[in-house]
Amino acid sequence: MADFDEIYEEEEDEERALEEQLLKYSPDPVVVRGSGHVTVFGLSNKFESEFPSSLTGKVAPEEFKASINRVNSCLRKNLPVNVRWLLCGCLCCCCTLGCSMWPVICLSKRTRRSIEKLLEWENNRLYHKLCLHWRLSKRKCETNNMMEYVILIEFLPKTPIFRPD
């Protein structure tokens, strides 16, 4: 029985090495940055809907634009409420010793989760079939030292056909 476990571990190591080798050859992810004029806790009020040239041949520009529009509509729905609570929280911050900022933090977290769920739905619906994976990621801004949320479009390695499931 111990020999069986050792063989299993060797096969597992081979699979892990093969996956790492496939990840080495995948191209750099595409970054879709926020292009809005309002940013609350690093989350912009809209993302760029311009089709990146590196996705040519992978996904249709119409599908890309539809996905970005879904994310932007989610932001359009949630962000005005967050801004109102942020202004209210800033006005009352001194009186409440900072506790008035908690609703803004919770609403911001809820907005991020709803976008992550939307991106996961998009991945399951379309993009995983095209060997792409969309996710919300925190990155450093190009212009200053602050952090911002961006959409990363990663290229998934194709699984070899000759390997059984």
Swiss-Prot record:
One GO CC term on file: Golgi-associated vesicle
Record's bilayer topology term: Peripheral membrane protein
Coiled coil in keyword set: yes
GO biological process, one term: Golgi to plasma membrane transport
UniProt motif (CHIC motif (Cys-rich)) ranges: 88-106
Subcellular location: Membrane; Golgi apparatus
Pfam families the UniProt entry points to: Erf4 (PF10256)
InterPro entries for this protein: CHIC1/2, Golgin_A_7/ERF4
UniProt family annotation: Belongs to the CHIC family.
PANTHER family assigned: CYSTEINE-RICH HYDROPHOBIC DOMAIN PROTEIN BRAIN X-LINKED PROTEIN, CYSTEINE-RICH HYDROPHOBIC DOMAIN-CONTAINING PROTEIN 2
Protein name as annotated: Cysteine-rich hydrophobic domain-containing protein 2
Species of origin: Mus musculus (Mouse)
Lineage, uppermost ranks: Eukaryota, Metazoa, Chordata, Craniata, Vertebrata
Recorded name of the encoding gene: Chic2
